Amino acid sequence: NLPMDVRFMLPSCVPATPLDEAGAVLDYRAIDPFYEHPRVQGLAEMMNYVGAVAADSQVLEKITAAQAHHKKIDGHAPGLKGMELNAYLAAGVYSDHECYDMEDALNKLRLGQYIMIREGTAARNLDALIPLLTPQYADRCMFCSDDKHPSDLLEKGHIDYHCRRAIAQGVDPIIAVKAATHNAARYYQLNNRGAISPGYLADFAIIDDFDHFHVQMVFKKGKLWYDGQVKPFSAPPIEETLVNRARDTFHLPRLKLE
């Protein structure tokens, strides 16, 4: 009951590769029950594009399970093209965030994928993909960070940084804001969000201008929650055992010089 939305995509590749060691092996049976949770939007980036193209049974089980729940399936297909890209899309992967240049992005757009324009800490693709933010292509584009360090979030911002940087390079502010809000909401089937209109939840922010994107006010479901400071709200108590588990996760024996 906090005044915010936090939504999830279920992991598609744990472990990340067959040779990797992880805390668990998550097949489709392990993740399938979580699709019933109202905050789960779909299956996260299908990194095993080789398995999808090769019709690996475990990969296809995860994809078909997501489809059975009418959920989105995000992609991860750097450089994939031709018949392999066709096969990947035919499996039911709806988006990709691994586009490094316009050629790759246009190949995927023409085949029906949505493009997540990534600007993170390590991978930074926004400048190369700025031409996507035009009326011809923008309706099937949205922003993502993929991986961004906390220090970068504090110093530069998150999706607001995408907007500032895109607008500074000449992108129409309406197109930039739409990629950050409306397009993402439509893609993830959050059909009562992403716009200010009758029938929509009144979730919106008021900024100072399109150059700085300093947030002045934040409304959630029509209620003002921030106007320079966060309004008081009641939060459920956090179990101490959960706090301790989150903090006590890294264990090494005492190191010696030799």
Per-range role (PLM):
Residues 1-72, 136:
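Divalent-metal coordination cores built from histidine and acidic residues
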Residues 5-7, 40-42, 72-74, 94-95, ...:
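Structural preference for beta-strand elements that scaffold enzyme active sites
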Residues 28-42, 88-107, 138-142, 171-172:
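Structural recognition of alpha->loop->beta junctions
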Residues 45-102, 119, 123:
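Divalent metal-binding pocket/active-site signature
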Residues 55, 82-89, 111, 125-138, ...:
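Histidine/acidic-residue-rich catalytic or RNA/ligand-binding cores of hydrolases
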Residues 76, 97-98, 116-122, 137-157:
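Short acidic/histidine-rich active-site segments
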Residues 154-170, 174-258:
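Active-site microenvironment of metallo-dependent hydrolases
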